[in-house]
Amino acid sequence: XIAGSEEYGKHCFKGAVADAYLAKH
């Protein structure tokens, strides 16, 4: 990958996990 793309993917993944966590709590 592209380094920037991989970092963006990690950021989006963390954001999705955070949203799911907040939705449950």
From Swiss-Prot:
- Point out the coiled-coil segments of this chain: none
Asked if the keyword Disulfide bond belongs to this entry, the reply reads no
> What is the uppermost EC class here?
ligase
- Any single Gene Ontology cellular-component annotation: chloroplast
The catalysed reaction is:
L-glutamate + NH4(+) + ATP = L-glutamine + ADP + phosphate + H(+)
Q: Where in the cell is it found?
A: Plastid, Chloroplast
Q: Which domain of life is it from?
A: Eukaryota
Named from the GO MF annotations, one term is: glutamine synthetase activity
* EC number(s) from the headed UniProt entry: 6.3.1.2
User: Sorted alphabetically, which keywords does the UniProt record give?
Assistant: ATP-binding, Chloroplast, Ligase, Nitrogen fixation, Nucleotide-binding, Plastid
Q: What function is annotated for this protein? A: Plays a key role in the nitrogen metabolism of microorganisms, animals and plants.
* Subunit and partners: Homohexamer.
Annotated family: Belongs to the glutamine synthetase family.
Descriptive protein name: Glutamine synthetase 2 isozyme
Organism source for this protein?
Answer: Emiliania huxleyi (Coccolithophore)
